[in-house]
Amino acid sequence: TTCMAEVIGDDLNAFIGNARKEGYIPEDFPVPFAHTPSFVGSHTTGWDNMFEGIARYFTLNFMEDKEVGANGKINFVPGFETYLGNYRVMHRMMREMGVEYSLLCDPTEVLDTPADGALRTYDGGTRLDERQDAPNAIDTLLLQPWQLPKTRKYVETTWKHDVPKISIPMGLEWTDEFLMKVSEISGKEIPASLALERGRLVDMMTDSHTWLHGKKISLYG
């Protein structure tokens, strides 16, 4: 929603239901919705409301046959993450570890398709069946948990996942924490390829500390 719809107090569920009855929307076409007025909170608040609304739409009334751990996967919820390179790194790390996972919001290919003359409509992304199967995962990791209070509450209370607390996988220490938590949940070892990658980062930090230690920097943009 936008501000005007929230000020008026539109009943989105009824609006969508009436549109189905009148034939504007096919009966079997999913239309999730979320309340995201811009006068409440920030972009991250809206993202949390959006994700919780989608998760609720696809799973709340379909929990009868769901069982925690049944699909052997780990769910990842990135939060309001705008740098698409981070998604690709996460995909690569999980593939190298051999971990079964679902990235429950994955705009990588949708927002970053190549300029090669080919038309790709809705390329990539998270499939609907992944979203519907999410409660069957072993657990769900929220990668920016301070942004996602509504999502955390829904996943804990409805999906019955533990949602362990972790820091955003950024930098050496927090990426270590992330990978070790994934290893603990999945039972998969962290491969030598990622250990070597970590070692190169430590080597780079050691080599450059003479020039960077104690220095202040400013970031713009």
Task: Pin down the residues of each PLM region.
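An N-terminal assembly and electron-transfer interface module characteristic of large anaerobic redox
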Residues: 1-221
